[in-house]
């Protein structure tokens, strides 16, 4: 089991905070009726403009019991090869949306993910940070992680 270090968590969480700030502005201007692809393009351009490497619609291959599955998953955004952002534009998030991101985290080995739903009346209550359970957290980070990342993947 890999151990998260504070520098890595703070770096990724800083990106998450910037994406959320930007997303709240986008949602207040566009509302909840644009296509998911519109929100995705805006976030991709915002992150790229701010110096991040962003892969959009990144195809992910994985190995299952020795069988190589090529292009088995497609993540919405992979930022700096460390953060997976999954976007939705639905009335409300359902358990399968969380499981989808959790699966992406598990099969890619990434530690943190962000799920954002632009389909609600507000972004409040329509986003979640997910922590991959394959990572353990040092004692010094336990309380911080519980506050910032309440949903485990």
Spans of model-derived segments:
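Basic/aromatic recognition patch in beta-strand/loop cores that engages polyanionic ligands
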Residues: 70-74
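Nucleic-acid nuclease catalytic cores
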Residues: 88-139
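Short, solvent-exposed polar/charged micro-motifs at secondary-structure junctions
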Residues: 64-68, 124-125
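A short acidic/basic microdomain associated with nuclease active sites
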Residues: 48-66
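Solvent-exposed, charged helical/coil patches
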Residues: 1-53, 124-125, 129-153
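Conserved catalytic cores of phosphodiester-cleaving nucleases, focusing on short active-site segments
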Residues: 31, 75-91, 104
């Amino acid at each position: 089991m890999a151990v998260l270090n504070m520098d890595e968590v703070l770096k990724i969480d800083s990106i998450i905070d910037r994406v959320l700030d930007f997303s709240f502005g986008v949602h207040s201007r566009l509302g909840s009726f644009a296509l998911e692809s519109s929100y995705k393009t805006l976030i991709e351009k915002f992150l790229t403009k701010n110096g991040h490497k962003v892969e959009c619609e990144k195809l992910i291959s994985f190995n299952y019991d020795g069988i190589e599955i090529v292009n088995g998953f497609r993540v919405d955004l992979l930022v700096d090869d460390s953060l997976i952002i999954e976007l939705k534009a639905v009335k409300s998030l359902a358990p399968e949306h969380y499981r989808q991101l959790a699966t992406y985290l598990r099969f890619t080995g990434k530690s943190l993910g962000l799920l954002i739903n632009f389909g609600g009346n507000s972004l409040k209550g329509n986003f979640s940070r997910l922590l991959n359970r394959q990572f353990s957290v040092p004692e010094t980070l336990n309380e911080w992680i519980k506050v910032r990342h309440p949903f485990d993947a």
